[in-house]
From Swiss-Prot:
Residues 16-252 form the Radical SAM core domain. It comes from Synechocystis sp. (strain ATCC 27184 / PCC 6803 / Kazusa). This is UPF0026 protein slr1464. Transmembrane segments: none annotated. InterPro entries: Aldolase_TIM, GTPase_Obg, rSAM.
Amino acid sequence: MNTTFPAVYGPVNSWRYGRSLGIDPIGAISTCSFNCVYCQLGEIEHLSGDRQIFIPTADILRELAQFAPWEVDVITLSGSGEPTLAKNLGEILEGIKKLTGKLTLVLTNATLLNDAQVREELSLADKISVKLDGLWPDQLQRINRPIAGIELEQILTGIQTFQQEFTGELSVQTMVLQPWDQTTENRYLELLSLIKPTEVQLNRPTRPKPLQRELEGRGNHTGTPYGDRPVTQIKCVDGQTLQNLAKKISGAIGIPVRCAPVKVL
């Protein structure tokens, strides 16, 4: 382990969750089962679906203690990849709650939700946000670029199973890269009716994608926090289009739908 790597970062201001302190259980080498085309970390360095302990729980909690009295709304597990890949996820969540008493949130791509152990550990959090960008198998491959063996049907089954077991708040987060036609909107409504989330969050990329690993990608920065380092500009929908879509979806399903503020860029 790189002992100089900061596993706790922020606080950052989130339009979704307020003032949030970040916990990174993955570590210095970005590790994920997705390699999303818009990822703010840059290209993922280690593509994997295997769970392991990246940073010992005691090290994370020791660092977290230095942030007392934790004047934040929520403590969020995300960071340098997919947090459910951390085999000590449950220990970390238990430790955070015991140490701080704060609400906990995990941002996940839902690729491991068919694993009963992962679902049990995630259930220790107060809030879970699952990613749903690809509404069809080909979209999943094109936008999220998962590791081999990950299929959309498996992800959807895992989310539905988890929702049936989870007593906290489950939100669906979707990155909208281009305007949706009616077929896409109908498909999204169909999937939401199966998942039955507490809330839907529509997002769009707020900055370019760096071409190499960027630690700054963990924060909620806007603009270009990468200086003169190489980036890829991402074409996406404008804020007003996103807001209009949010109103349509909310009106159709009766579930709260929020979206990134128009002036986020």
